[in-house]
Amino acid sequence: MAAVQGSAARLVEVALAEEGYVEGPKDNETKFGAFTGSNFQPWCGSFVMWCANEAQVKMPNTVYTPAGAQAFMKAGTWQKAEEATPQPGDIAYFDFPNDGVDRISHVGIVVKDNGDGTVMVIEGNTTKAKAGDQRNGGEVCLQRRAYKKKNGSKVMPSKPVAIVGFGRPAFGTPVKKKEVKAAAPAKPAAKKAPAKTPAKTSAPKKK
């Protein structure tokens, strides 16, 4: 039985159902980007927005990740990573160390807090490959990510801190789901009428 629409549990449920999704056939081509009108662009934010729509959860537009984080801050529903108590359904924002981009550049949905300074996050446009691009990897993956400097355990190794903070959507009352209209089939090109052959004129008779 599906979790209640508009709830954190439903948001997580919807997101986890997409695990294993791979972009294509073109680079950054996804149903998530088609939904937000940002197809063929990095799509981690579009994935989150698509999931929120399916779960009927109200949250700021986070297709552009820095703007999404700023909106949560402005709404007073933002927690800095080191001070946070993340919960399932929270929106995790990332700034990966040493990736050449010194700002928030990735986003995902918290599945659970591991209790060791790390969380499990379901993310779009990432990869399980250690050497792969974590913020443009082309897949939907469940990842273990650190949000506190002191993290890990005897069983699980520590990880570099990538999460800078969490935003909490307005769970509770479901918002109306936006339906995605299928693109109309392309109309066949009109056939050109064959060119008319000019009528032959007979040479004037000699008198």
Stretches with model-predicted labels:
Residues 8-11, 86-87, 120:
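Alpha-helical scaffolds flanking conserved acidic
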Residues 11, 51, 58, 65-67, ...:
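Generic signature of intrinsically disordered, low-complexity, basic-rich segments
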Residues 24-88, 94, 98-99:
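Catalytic cysteine-centered active-site loop
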Residues 5, 102-207:
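Aromatic- and glycine-rich peptidoglycan recognition patches
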